[in-house]
Each structure stands twice: as structure tokens, then as C-alpha cells.
Amino acid sequence: MTEEAGRLLPRYSHAGGFRVAENKPVDQDCIFCRIVANESPSHRIWEDDNHLAFLSIYPNTPGVTVVIPKAHRPSYVFDNDDETVCALMKAARKVAGMLDQRLEGVGRTGVIFEGYGVDHLHAKLFPMHGTGDGSSFRRIESKGMDRFFERYEGYLSSHDALRADDDALSAMARRIRGE
């Protein structure tokens, strides 16, 4: 097998209403593919045969980590097959454990699958500094945040906003259920 034949890139097919990625040669314009191929620098912290984890060069907190499959896959997590998603989540879980154990004051790590910065499937891990006091679950609230987003602004936020109206929530639930 040639080196290029061993690299992968998604080609979409439709299966059960979902776009499922199939394999074809790597995207040479993809920064993550270039990192995998050691053609671009990165601060690697973990890898196995199929996945790679490296520190984000644009962290919003110390230790933000990107976990990727080494094979190029579409960036929208739900466009990928179950095997690919589950394998990535297992890799992310392994790396999150490393962050929890090795970063002072980190007891939990958050994960998102945003997929807009680079068109290559990836999980972003966010060490939650200040959660590593050794105790079991404790509630941490995001009080005083009333920012509501009508549309995506380039980042995700998990803060609570103002209490939503139950009639509006019921209408939204019916819409999502297709009623």
C-alpha cells in the first residue's frame, strides 16, 4: 500500500437519513492531517494507532486539548458512523483522565464536539480548573449569566441563562418531536 493510499478522507454516502463518511485519501489542506503526518508542529500529549491528542494553540484555559482520529473524517460528529464516534469518545475519555490526574486543581474535564474551526472530526477537552478538591459531586452554578444566543457566534457556552417559559419549551419540544 502506498503512503497516500493509507491516508483517509471522508466521502459522504447516505444511510438511514444520516450522512456517513467513507474513506478516501487525506486532505492535504487540513491542518490536523498535517499534524498527524508530522508536517506541522504540535504539542502532542498522547496518541495510539488511531488517535492523537495535542494541546490547543488557542486555549481559553490552561490545558485545552484537541483529540482527533488520525484518519480524516468529517468535522460534524453526527455525520460519522457509530464506530468512529465511539472510538473518538474512548480516546477523549483516556486523555481527559490524564488531564484530571496531572493538572493541579482539575477534578473534571468538559468535552465538546463543535466542528467549525477545522473540518476534521475532533473533540475539544476543557480542564475545569478549581474542581479538583477530591470530593464527590458538588454543584457549581453559573449565576448571574443572562446571555441567550439566537444563533451560533463561534463558540459554545454551558452557562445557565434566564429561566425559560414552559409554554415556549413545550412548543419547542413538539417541534423537535415533529408534531
Where are these regions (language model features)?
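HIT superfamily nucleotide-processing domains
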Residues: T2-E179
